[in-house]
Amino acid sequence: FENNIEVINILRKNCLGICKNNQFKIYDEDLINSKLEIEFQNISVVYIDPPYAKYNLTNLLENLSSNIKNTTVIGLETGVKDNIVIPENLNLLQKKTYGKTIIYFFKLS
């Protein structure tokens, strides 16, 4: 999910470098305003990046975790000062800190 056309073009180019055209889909819309229960049942990877302060990341993770399949991986990029609560049904696979940024990877428990 992305609503910036320049970023969509970069994402498409990067995805084509690692998979075939029919193996990925980039949704041209805002994740928050999407129809989660419909879209996420077929998605294998979700990556959430800035602007983090614009949304309540805890609520976003809760909504995602109740609408994805067991094999979906969620990547979340936050600032080190951001305070998020990880839903109990998400298992932390990996956490990396890069300067002022933290990247998390989750899967359903």
Give the role of each language-model region:
Residues 1-109:
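Class I S-adenosyl-L-methionine-dependent methyltransferase catalytic core
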